[in-house]
Amino acid sequence: MTSKLEQLKKITTVVADTGDFDAIARVKPVDATTNPSLLLKAAAIPGYADLLNACVNDCKGDVGLASDRFGVAVGQEILKVIPGRISTEVDARLSFDTEAMLKRAHRLIELYDKAGIGRDRVLIKIASTWEGIRAAEKLEREGIQTNLTLLFSFAQAVACAEAGVFLISPFVGRIYDWYKKATGNDYQGADDPGVQSVTRIYNYYKANDYKTVVMGASFRNLNQIEQLAGCDRLTISPDLIEKLAADTGKLERKLSPGKTGEARQSLNEAQFRWASNEDAMATEKLAEGIRQFARDQEKLEALLAAKL
């Protein structure tokens, strides 16, 4: 029998959500994504010690540069075992500063370039704030493709599409977490608010012929993944990928182009901010996500600073 993983791979590009290249080599995804939290976990893996030490050389005390070098070094290793692309994230503490995000994105691309890795194999991850979307819009015009992360609302998805970003990462599990805590309900199947969010965005993009790739992210269980079978891409943790590989049940396609979606919309900054303000879940989860990534960035930098 064909596993659910193999069935999924026929209709969706499977991406590994991890910085552990041993796990990536084991599950064999097309692409991989990292973030500050995953890099912090990777830094604790004994096999990464030499990589971590090498990243602090010649940094002249610049812990931010050392951190970027580590992110790129991890990406470089991952690219040795995947055929596709690596997503590397801009420092979350810059999420409300367009120019600072642009500078950091350019530095990441420069570091990849020095390592002999072309921009066609890299996606720059940026938080889906208004400022982040504006930075991504400029990067796309420069030929640097982006992955807009921490996306929790339809307004964020609309703004990203209008900006022409290459890919968005709408979160499923964190939306589910918020609604479960707020209501006490344990949502299942198509009733899951995270699943509903990604489905709505996917249908909207396809109905309006947006080229932006929809990559569902942040999964809590296999059912959430199965409910989004057919999505352009899904970024999944290695443990859930392995569970899919062990399941030989039938996988039904849930998402496909051609279904009815909402009419094309456009949001200016004031409209975007108002829509965000009206969405308590998205406001709270975006702020929480940025704070968590920022704290993990600081922990990673403290680890690197001790080696400088």
From Swiss-Prot:
One of its GO terms (cellular component) is cytosol. Pathway: Carbohydrate degradation; pentose phosphate pathway; D-glyceraldehyde 3-phosphate and beta-D-fructose 6-phosphate from D-ribose 5-phosphate and D-xylulose 5-phosphate (non-oxidative stage): step 2/3. Keywords: Cytoplasm, Pentose shunt, Schiff base, Transferase. Its EC number is 2.2.1.2. One of its GO terms (molecular function) is transaldolase activity. GO terms for biological process: carbohydrate metabolic process; pentose-phosphate shunt. InterPro entries: Aldolase_TIM, TAL/FSA, Transaldolase_1, Transaldolase_AS. NCBIfam families: PRK12346.1, talAB. Belongs to the transaldolase family. Type 1 subfamily. Homodimer. This is Transaldolase. It comes from Pseudomonas fluorescens (strain ATCC BAA-477 / NRRL B-23932 / Pf-5).
